[in-house]
Structure formats: structure tokens, C-alpha cells
């Protein structure tokens, strides 16, 4: 929290030369900050520390001002696939403060994120190796989260059909879907990111 600048940005701001096995550049990447937003929400839920509300409000104003020039995919593709984590935090804060600019930001995040509605409609979830399995876990919820702002039934339908396809084409006996890095069908022998996908799939739902 002490790293937050006057414009609302927070976290590391300096890039370093490359080093094998480490990501030392892209310090302004949107995605790592989405992880921190979830932590801040949980901290507020435990403490009611009002500094969290001020902190997140400033950061979301920074996002609204900066995303038009440096969209979610500017530094890496992770933020496009995992924007749901950002979106749910925006709506969480909106439900506490009622600040109208948060809905504007929510719409912008949705526009810049990977379209899971299109993914489902293309039938991508009926094939193998079409998406990174953790991106799927974090992103499949985005349409139903955005439905809180735009009640077009296509968002509900896409999530329902998406989970149906996942169960039919990738479902496994333990209740999760087959995927180590990419979706790999319902063969139970390859390893799966079970713990991570279970956590991320549940989080925003």
C-alpha cells in the first residue's frame, strides 16, 4: 500500500535486464495487480480498514485513465484472459461506494478482455489445446460477472454452455477438467493443475 503513487498506480515500477527463468521486465503489467486486488478485498473483509477503499478507488481511477492508451494486452496477454479478477473487484467496490466511474471502468475492462462468449460460440471447448487451463478457470466466469452490468442473456447462456462442454469433452472423475498447460480432454492419465484450477474456478463464482 505504501507503494501507491498520487495517480493511483501501485507496485513495482522499474524494469530490469532479462535473466533466464525470471520475468524482470513488464513491471507495469496489469495482471499481477489483479492478484493483489483479491488480497486487498480479503484484507478489508477481515478488518474493515477504510484505507483499502481509498486505495482501490485511486487505482481504479488510474486504470480508467490509462487503459485507453495502454490496454490490458499492452504488456502481456495474461491480463486479457484473466480480466475477470479485475472486473469482480471493480463491482465489489461499486457495491460499497456507488461511484459511477466504476461502471465505466467495468465496461472498458469487458471490452478489452478476451471474449469467452466468442470462445464458447466457436466450439473451442469441444477441442483439445485451445486454451491454457488456468486462463480458462479464471476467465470462464467473466461473462456472468459482467452480466451484473449488462443483462444480455447471451452472457448467461455462454457460461452454461461452456461448463456443459467442459464436462462433456474434458470432465474427469474428480470433478475437474483435463488440463496441464492446455486443455487435454478427459483422459485421466496426464497430470492436471487440479488445485490451482479448482481455486480459480470457484473464486469469483
Label each region the model flagged.
Residues 194-201:
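Conserved small/polar residues in nucleotide/adenosyl-binding loops
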Residues 1-9, 54-71, 104-122, 158-175:
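Long, well-ordered core segments of solenoidal/helical folds
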Residues 2-45:
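Active-site-adjacent substrate/metal-binding segments within catalytic domains
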Residues 11-28, 115-129, 177-191:
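Aromatic- and acidic-residue-enriched carbohydrate-binding clefts of CAZyme catalytic domains
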Residues 27-92:
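A conserved hydrophobic secondary-structure block that centers on an alpha-helix together
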Residues 8-18, 55, 75-86, 174-184:
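Short, solvent-exposed turn/loop segments enriched in Gly/Ser/Thr/Pro and often Arg
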Residues 43-57, 94-107, 147-160:
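Structural helix-adjacent loops and short alpha-helical linkers that scaffold large soluble proteins
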Residues 82-115:
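Active-site region of glycoside hydrolase catalytic domains
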Amino acid at each position: 500500500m505504501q507503494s501507491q503513487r498520487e495517480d493511483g498506480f501501485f507496485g513495482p515500477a522499474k524494469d530490469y535486464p532479462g535473466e533466464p527463468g525470471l520475468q524482470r521486465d513488464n513491471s507495469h503489467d496489469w495482471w499481477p495487480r489483479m492478484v493483489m486486488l483479491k488480497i486487498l478485498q480479503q484484507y478489508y473483509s477481515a478488518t474493515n480498514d477504510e484505507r483499502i477503499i481509498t486505495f482501490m478507488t485511486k487505482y481504479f481511477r488510474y486504470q480508467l485513465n490509462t487503459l485507453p492508451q495502454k490496454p490490458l494486452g499492452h504488456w502481456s496477454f495474461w491480463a486479457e484472459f484473466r480480466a475477470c479478477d479485475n472486473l469482480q473487484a471493480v463491482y465489489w467496490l461499486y457495491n460499497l461506494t456507488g461511484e459511477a466511474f466504476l461502471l465505466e471502468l467495468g465496461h472498458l475492462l469487458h471490452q478489452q478482455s478476451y471474449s469467452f462468449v466468442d470462445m464458447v460460440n466457436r466450439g473451442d471447448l469441444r477441442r483439445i489445446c485451445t486454451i491454457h487451463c488456468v486462463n480458462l478457470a479464471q476467465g470462464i466466469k467473466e461473462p456472468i460477472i459482467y452480466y451484473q452490468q449488462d443483462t444480455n442473456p447471451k452472457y448467461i447462456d455462454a457460461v452454461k454452455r461452456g461448463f456443459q462442454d467442459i464436462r462433456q469433452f474434458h470432465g474427469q472423475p474428480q470433478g475437474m477438467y483435463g488440463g496441464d498447460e492446455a486443455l487435454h480432454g478427459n483422459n485421466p492419465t496426464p497430470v492436471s493443475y487440479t488445485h490451482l484450477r479448482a481455486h480459480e474456478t470457484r473464486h469469483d463464482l
